[in-house]
Amino acid sequence: MSNEIPTLRDPQDRRLPRISPPCGLVIFGITGDLARKKLLPAIYDLANRGLLHPAFSLTGFARRDWSPQDFEEYVRASIEAHTRTGFNEGTWNQLRSGLRFVSGTFDDPEAYRRLADTVAELDRVRGTGGNHAFYLSIPPSYFPVVAKHLSDTGLNKRQGREWRRVIIEKPFGHNLESARELSDVISQIFDEQDVFRIDHYLGKETVQNIMAMRFANAMFEPLWKANYVDSVQITMAEDIGIGTRAGYYDGIGAARDIIQNHLLQLMALTAMEEPVHFTPEEIRAEKEKVLSAVRLPEDLAIDTARGQYASGWQGGAQVRGYLEEDGIPADSTTDTFAAIKLFVDTRRWAGVPFYLRAGKRLGKRVTEIAVIFKRSAHVPFGNSALSESAQNALVIRVQPDEGLTLKLGAKVPGTSMQVRDVTMDFAYGHAFTEDSPEAYERLILDALVGSAPLFPHQREVEASWKILDPILSFWETQGQPESYAPGTWGPQSAHDMLARDGRFWRLP
């Protein structure tokens, strides 16, 4: 543990080239798991790398009856347990001087008056300059009451060149109607340009690298079209169950929790056209074009699949099925696995199926985008020389082991012509000596500096729900989801969905 106060970041460090202005961040739900494990460590790591202005302040808002010292101890413990850059007393002392805590419930007007007084005191004493962001790390059901009190106390109002912003966590509603209702609540007190919707997957280095790989390398972009691409598979798999999240997860499920935001955003980045300029407006516009061009399959019964994990053995241990988890009703129809087939009706992607799947208690923890290329039209040494899966593929590994894998055919050493699949791998951890910023570091800094390319616009949110709502409505009429064994890759119906098309799921 070092006591030396760190200097500003290395000027050659271009991973996060901007520094926040003088500002404050207010976190509602400061005692939740997200704040404790992700937000507080990310804020500290930004400060530890010299990327937060010395005037930065952090205010927590929660029901706990804490003294300032209690709050400091909580923040420090969270940082020490989860920091990525190592604990430094100098950084901590600088950050600690800007810590404040306001005790109160979300519906307590007096608590918001105390919060307004705290914000004014920080502007006066700390020099935050009237710039404040409000992070709603709380369930969406509390958004209306928090928004109302922020408005009633004038905390959403700015003067001159000051700014006030709001950062909200998913889910952005549970269907199109509720998403619009939430947007209406927020838009009454904040302009759209001041609303930052967090999808932490968009802050991951590999996701941002999709655009760099496509548009900075002439070898990939010419092949990135229906002429050469057979299909695209986007997978987000977890090898764990719901744990203690029954209250959140039941009634939401894999499709709402993962496909509606993470996977449709990954699909949009994969399928979008090159923006004229690398600006938030133009990147968002290209993603919106993709989402608006999505077409559902005609028969949802055979081209979608949903499931629930059953009890069984996984990783050498006996695990409970979803319906046996604490807090889950015995008749729950919530999906813990979801798979869908979509089409993007543009000239580039006409006829190319996009297969999206997400689930819990699957074979391994992995998130990847696999662009599967068409087989060679003619092979001079005969198809018998090829392996059964002889298709080139470019796989973008989002997590873990971030990187790229190119699958291609190569001759097996020997006297006969036999071609087998081999891979060429690029791994971030091997190619770059420095660590990539954690996703929340990038997103929090972007929100503080007002850069929005990695934050979905409300139009993207609504377009995503327009895609998913018909599927969810159909599933509601289908009774209980199909069960699948833990440690497998989902229900049989998901495999049948691709088998009918003469394809199979890639094994990550």
Q: Predicted segment positions?
A:
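Secretory/organelle targeting and membrane-embedding segments
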Residues: M1-I168, F172-P508
